[in-house]
């Protein structure tokens, strides 16, 4: 498996050929300040906790680099002071190269941090693995990978017990991509894409305060322009502990 989830964590290890990458999505540094401004919600900063959790994963899997699938920061535009300090502290602590595939929240990152390798918005391909945030269509080169990793959706499942109680859990979503929506987007015949039916891996949000999309609840809509049409109907959901839930629409 080219992309192997880390058991019990919203992270995976990607085999990129020449190197192994620790991959996470939707870190949302500075989210507490954003929630205070956007919703009037007061939460104590978990900046230290986020950094420690990511560094613990680095120690656990010993990667050559870290890839963030977008939304490293929460504030759209130039990072605020607290957010900037959080990211600088993270870079100091990680001590391995960090690549960011920019998301819709990362507009000011390239100018603010010279220690981050910022990819193009259309994504990045390393070996047989492609990386995108998911808020825009992937580049064709990314779609040529065997496995494509994305964030943006913050997938969650709503689970209910026999007496009507319920809980929400972060989840992975994995399935094959359909060629038709991508051929339509690029304005070419399906054959012209050299389609190899790549697997899509939608990552749970690393930040547990960032909400999410209930992928198994009717009426909840996806955020990405190529979902759900670009994903096979038999795509499956998995919990962070690895439990396979089956086809995500029927969980």
Role assignments for model-derived ranges:
Residues 115-185:
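A contiguous pocket-lining binding segment that forms or flanks enzyme active sites
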Residues 1-22, 249:
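Zn-dependent metallo-beta-lactamase
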Residues 30-32, 74-76, 104-112, 137-141, ...:
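Active-site environment of divalent metal-dependent phosphoester hydrolases
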Residues 91-94, 141-144, 195-196:
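Short, conserved loop/helix-junction motifs that constitute active-site signature segments
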Residues 16, 61-62, 142-144:
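Glycine-rich phosphate-binding loop signature in dinucleotide/nucleotide-binding domains
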Residues 22-27, 31-128:
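Core catalytic region of metal-dependent phosphoesterases/phosphodiesterases
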Residues 21-28, 128-135, 148-150, 201-204:
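Active-site-proximal beta-strand elements of phosphoester/diester hydrolases
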Residues 160-251:
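Acidic, His/Gly-rich catalytic cores of divalent-metal-dependent hydrolytic chemistry
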